[in-house]
């Protein structure tokens, strides 16, 4: 796992994109502060760049680095979540502009899964984490379901958990609006 993390960090530091296991499904990732790397992910997924992608980080303590005016309810939601939870915050900062929603919002998930948490810790920046599929196609439940077009389009494929055949599901998503308005998306 350590070698995988080191190689993935080197690739992302150079502006490349990776295929990696997360706390939910396999994801395509890159440096969430690098607009060119984010653009590569949009192109690989054949996804319109007006559709935001989420960010993965290893600690709730880092959220204030990427979110302006952190809503108080967010801390409660993070604390009580018993499954992976992506929260869409209304005002992002210090992230690639092409990663954000048209309204300046950003979805961030704090990962507790060992590999993705250690990857975030080692990289010291937030990661893009978007499903490893072409836009409009089903999300892969495990590595074996990731299409060849995605595998061939990334700069590095993490070896860790490639043999894990258990089916994973995407995270729950909650959107927080100004004034603490909560909307369940998924």
Which stretches of residues belong to each language-model region?
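Active-site-adjacent structural elements in enzyme catalytic cores
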Residues: 1-186
